[in-house]
Regions:
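Acidic, contiguous N-terminal accessory segments
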Residues: 1-91, 136-146
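Feature activates predominantly on carbohydrate-active enzymes
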Residues: 34, 40-46, 50, 82-84, ...
């Protein structure tokens, strides 16, 4: 299986893993764009890590531009400065668009997609992680999935 994870940032091919773990260098309140890049990159790394556990022989790469004909999961935030946690999983011709209202929505959308694959997290760390059997293939949603917090304050504190 070949899959592209499309991020909305130039240089995603080489910088995604670095951005994903740069939270200690970012002031999320004063530099929300850098915060969004960090969170969305972390979501991409989580997605690739978990999908590779399901499909160890897969070739999954990060890209900033989609290549025609390749399956792709596109990560998109409606706003890089908003803190919205709503998300949508939108089936596309050759993949999936995970669209969040903000950076947190993208992360929640990635975890929802992984839950569809059979992943469960019963407690923090790998000890509380339930993984689907390797080689079972990807399950693509047939219909759009939408979710938004019922609270205007978000899902938690």
């Amino acid at each position: 299986m070949e899959l592209e994870i499309l991020l909305p940032f130039p240089s995603a091919e080489t910088m995604t893993e670095s951005w994903a773990f740069s939270e200690a260098q970012i002031d999320f309140r004063h530099d929300p764009e850098a915060g969004a890049r960090c969170t969305i990159s972390y979501a991409a790394v989580e997605l690739r890590t978990h999908l590779l556990q399901m499909e160890p022989d897969a070739q999954i790469c990060f890209v900033s531009q989609r290549h025609n004909g390749k399956a792709a999961i596109e990560l998109h935030a409606d706003s890089l400065t908003a803190s919205g946690d709503a998300y949508a999983l939108l089936p596309q011709k050759d993949g999936l668009l995970i669209r969040g209202a903000g950076r947190v929505g993208v992360l929640y959308g990635v975890y929802e997609f992984l839950k569809m694959q059979g992943w469960r997290w019963l407690e923090p760390g790998t000890a509380g992680e339930y993984a689907p059997e390797p080689g079972c293939g990807l399950l693509w949603p047939k219909n759009a999935v939408h979710d938004a917090s019922a609270s205007t304050l978000g899902r938690g504190f």
